A protein has these predicted regions:
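A transmembrane-helix-recognition feature enriched in membrane-embedded lipid enzymes
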Residues: 1-40, 343, 350, 354
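Residue-level signal for inorganic ion chemistry
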Residues: 16, 56, 105, 142, ...
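Phosphate/Mg2+-binding loops and adjacent switch elements
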Residues: 78-214
Length: 358
């Protein structure tokens, strides 16, 4: 579900939005507004459009690359949370209070500090003041590319293969929240959701479409879905779904089509595709609707990892049998071995020099 709507009436507000973005970038480019450079190297992962590029799996990919050598903190806004002010996320937190994506990251990587704060500069200053033995050695800043109040050591811009920012327009006519030329500030561009059947000529054509600078690398990532996994821990696991099972797929994410395609590939008998808004907070009515879908012994509900974080807090409202029929598809992203090595080298160099001499 893309946010942009190509309604001609939205052209005027899109022009005004683009003008405002241009003024803001000009003020930073000319030094009239100042960014903050942290003493801790910051790896920024973001995009110039809203939603649908898979930022969280790429944050997790970077964590996997770095966690054996550095103490890591993830800094995120915690979009959609009801909690106010800064927060350190724990594995037992409620997604409604800290955000679904921060909770997902913390549950996967308990050793990583996950810090939620909309004020990125304040958050970095807080992390800098931690005792030396606990202070992170690198901060991965999620969805922070447009936040120029922070100067990263290394910036990564994500863009979807089937909807690159070069073919987009400013919000609300399109989905751009920053000028496409802002991508020049990034050291790397990752093209996400690259189809498995892409030929070398397709990749070269995409590289030709992107306005790459000499100092920029481009990478192509692919989603890797795992097997359907029970969402709730239970003493009495239920039967696993089979390709013949009757499946209802539920997604409250920015661009659910890739997820739905995978569910239909794994389970050809998928009957229902239910779409909610990104970060949708599940309520009693939603839960009742979902419960009705899994009353039959051969019915299962499969959702995304991110939705799963929001559903966990409703465990007490479900019977053990119902909990056993709710699963999620874990997702990671992969690069080719050659690109993975190159990307890792660039990250380590940026961390070592805190962004200098890239």
């Amino acid at each position: 579900m893309r946010i942009g709507s190509h309604n001609i009436l939205l052209k005027v507000p899109a022009l005004l939005y683009g003008w405002g973005v241009g003024v803001r970038n000009f003020l930073y480019d000319e030094g009239m507004l100042k960014g903050y450079k942290s003493s801790i190297p910051v790896i920024c992962i973001g995009n110039v459009a809203v939603g649908g590029t898979g930022k969280t799996p790429h944050v997790e990919r970077v964590i996997r690359m770095l966690r054996d050598e550095y103490r890591i903190a993830v800094l995120t806004r915690g979009y959609g949370r009801s909690g106010k002010g800064p927060a350190v996320v724990s594995v037992d937190d409620d997604a409604s209070m800290v955000g679904d994506e921060p909770l997902q990251i913390k549950r996967k990587f308990p050793e990583v500090i996950v810090y939620v704060d909309g004020d990125r500069k304040r958050a970095l200053q807080t992390l800098e003041q931690m005792p030396e033995e606990l202070r992170p050695e690198v901060v991965v800043m999620d969805d922070g590319f447009q936040h120029r109040a922070v100067i990263p050591a290394y910036s990564i811009v994500l863009t979807a293969y089937d909807h690159p920012f070069t073919r987009d327009s400013f919000m609300p006519y399109g989905t751009l929240r920053d000028d496409p030329s802002s991508a020049d500030r990034a050291e790397s561009i990752i093209v996400t959701h690259t189809p498995d059947d892409c030929k070398p000529i397709d990749l070269r054509m995409m590289m030709g479409e992107l306005p790459l600078k000499d100092y920029q690398d481009v990478y192509f990532s692919r989603p890797m879905y795992g097997a359907a996994t029970p969402l709730f821990d239970t003493d009495q696991p239920g039967p696993a779904p089979t390709p013949e099972s009757r499946i209802s797929a539920v997604a409250g994410i920015a661009d659910p089509e890739h997820f739905f395609d995978k569910v239909r590939e794994l389970f050809p008998e998928t009957e229902e595709l239910i779409v909610y808004d990104d970060h949708h907070p599940y309520d009693e009515d939603d839960l009742e609707e979902l419960r009705e879908l899994i009353q039959d012994p051969d019915c299962f509900l499969i959702t995304t990892e991110k939705d799963g974080m929001r559903l966990l807090s409703h465990a007490d409202q479900l019977t053990p049998e119902e909990r056993s029929r709710i699963l999620y598809l874990p997702i990671e992203v992969s690069l080719s071995p050659k690109q993975e090595r190159r990307f890792r080298e660039r990250l380590h160099r940026a961390i070592k020099n805190n962004g200098l001499h890239l």
